[in-house]
Amino acid sequence: MSSEGFVNLDKPAGWTSHDCVAKLRRLLRERRIGHGGTLDPAVTGVLPIAVGRATRLLPYLPSGKTYVGTIRFGLQTSTDDLTGDRLAEADTSHLSREAIEAALPQFLGHIQQQPPQVSAVQVQGQRLYQLARRGEAPTELPWRTVEIQSIRILQWRSGSQAELSVEIHCGAGTYIRSLARDLGAVLGVGGTLAELRRTASSGFDLNQSTPLTELLDGAAVPLLALDLPLQHLAKVQLSAETSDRWRQGQAMPVPDSVLPDAAPVRVYDLNGQFLGIGAIAAGLCKPKVVLAAL
């Protein structure tokens, strides 16, 4: 059988997420490779990679992400980070930590956010970065609902261009560049993202990640179990007879199930073999992703 599983990759700066996928395709000689959650080239950290049949499980990974980053106040750029053109500068000597703490709560919970002018968000079928390259950036960026669970201040450095280091827990689709821009706007001085590292994503943690540089130096690609990042889903275990029928596409009863309808679950046979993903409906477990076919 060809290579399959997940790779908890630590992406270096300067690489796109697509670059990482292309490199692993060559290293593993496997075409079926995808990633869970794009990282901008300048951003480092956790990039979940799915190999082989694991690509079918990407929609079921948890959506939570954690970032550690630095916001620089008194600077606005065309990309909302340091890679863009400088648009405006302001002195931030008057800015205080207390002012930051007073402003942060409005960015918590479900909020409306506009993506950066240079981003992968699509407008009328084209990505914003493609429009920006042609000088056709839209006058009005789309608003999107995102969720930020927490923002924790790690360090505050006052000065003429003050900097704030934070840890952010958020949902999928949140742009930390937009947060830096919008926080700076609320404070009246402008802001841009100076540095960002993703420390957790989709069930994977930076502490257990493998740097891409190690793989480039010849280290073996560590493939993790298909069900490793799916522990947030409830587990259903089927008997020998029902597991065979489930793998043939039949919905099977789940005894004493208290799971809500449409809830995705991990499905196993009595030997503990991971069979795939099911969905609960009226006490039945319907096959959604069958990995271990008969």
From Swiss-Prot:
Record CDD domains: PseudoU_synth_EcTruB, PUA_TruB_bacterial
Gene Ontology BP, a term: tRNA pseudouridine synthesis
Alphabetized UniProt keyword annotations: Isomerase, tRNA processing
InterPro entries: PsdUridine_synth_cat_dom_sf, PsdUridine_synth_N, PUA-like_sf, PUA_sf, tRNA_psdUridine_synth_TruB, tRNA_sdUridine_synth_fam1_C, TruB_C
Gene Ontology MF annotations: RNA binding; tRNA pseudouridine(55) synthase activity
EC numbers: 5.4.99.25
Catalytic activity as recorded in UniProt: uridine(55) in tRNA = pseudouridine(55) in tRNA
Key word RNA-binding present: no
Pfam (any one): TruB-C_2
Catalytic residue list: 40
Keyword tRNA processing: yes
UniProt similarity note: Belongs to the pseudouridine synthase TruB family. Type 1 subfamily.
Protein's job: Responsible for synthesis of pseudouridine from uracil-55 in the psi GC loop of transfer RNAs.
Name of the featured protein: tRNA pseudouridine synthase B
Organism this protein belongs to: Synechococcus elongatus (strain ATCC 33912 / PCC 7942 / FACHB-805) (Anacystis nidulans R2)
Lineage of source species: Bacteria, Bacillati, Cyanobacteriota, Cyanophyceae, Synechococcales
Gene: truB
